[in-house]
Amino acid sequence: MKIIEIAKKIEKNGGRLYLVGGAVRDHLLGRENHDEDYCVVGIEEKEFQELFPQAIKRGKSFGVYDLEEKEFALARKEIKTGEGHQAFKIETASDITIEEDLKRRDITINAIAKDVLTGEYKDPFGGREDIQKKIIRATTKAFQEDPLRVYRVARFASTLQFKVEMQTLKMMKQIEPELKTISKERIYEELKKALKGISPSLFFITLKQADVLYTHFKEIERLIGAEQPKQYHPEGDAFVHSMEVLDRVAQVTEKEEIRFAALVHDLGKGETPKEEYPHHYGHDKKGIIPIKNMCRHLGLPNKWEKCGITATKEHMIGGIFHQMKPSKQVDFIERVAKSPLGLERNEDHCRSRWKRDSRF
C-alpha cells in the first residue's frame, strides 16, 4: 500500500497524515533520508488498528506502529514525571493536534510537519527559517525536560554544521545536573553519530560553549587552556589543535575508530602541570591512561581504545622518522600496520603534526 493510499484511508475516517521529523528537515536541506516517520492525527489508536490490521505495534510503545516499512505514530503529548530522559507519561488521543504533537519535539528544525495529501507545511516554531539561517533552536522551555537533548543538539551541530543559538545553549547548561542520568549506551550512540558528521569537532565545541563538556568528556575538557609552543601551534591550545586534527582526519576517512584516534591523540597534554607549559614532555605516554579511562566510563568499543592508544603512543615518531635507522623505520611501520589503526593515517594530519619538531 502506497503512502498516499494510507493517507486517503485515514482522511476518510476523519484524520490526517503528516510526514514529520528528520525526513522533512532533510528534504528541506536537500539531503537524503530513507527513514520516514509519520504522525497520525484525528483518530484513536483502536481505529488505526482496525484500518490497518497489518500494522505491527512497536513493543509496549504508546501508539507507534510499523507499516509498509515505515513508522507511524499517533499524535501524542509527553508529561514529565521525574528525573532523567525516560521519565515521561505519554498520552495519545484523537483531539491532539499536529501543532501540539510538534510542541513536544526538541528543536525547531525537527518540529516541522508536511501534510501527505496537500503538501502543506505545519511549522509553528519557525523551523524552516532556522534551516535557512543554519540555526539550532529549542522549540520551547520544555526542551529542558529531557537531558539527552543536550547531546542531540551537539550532534546535530556536527552533522549539519549549524550554530546553536544562545538561549538554547543556556538551557543546555541548566539541564547539566540531569546529564548523569543518561546511560553510557545512549551517550555512545550520540558520540558515534557525531563522529560521522561533516564537522565532528562541533559536537565538542558546542558542549564547551554550553559549559557541559566536563560532565562526560572531562578528559577532553582538560585540553582547554593547555598552552602549546606558538611556533608549532599558532592555532591555539591543545583543545583547538585536537579539534582541527579531528576535522582534517574526518575529511579523508569515515572510519569512526580513526576519527576517535584523532580526537584523543593528544589527551596526554591535559595531564601536563601548568608550570611546564607550553611544553608537554612525555605527553604521548601520559595520554594512555586518560584514553583508557574515557573508553571505560563511556563504554566505548575496544577497537576505539586500541586505535586511540596507538595514535597517542606513535604520533610523535613522525617528527624524527627521517632521522631513524632503516630498521627502526621498519619497526615503526610494522607496529602501526599491525594495530587496529592500520596505515590509514590522515596525510594532512601527518603533515601538520609529524613534520614538526618533536620536542614538545
Q: Where are each of the predicted segments found?
A:
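Catalytic cores of the polymerase beta-like nucleotidyltransferase superfamily
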Residues: 1-360
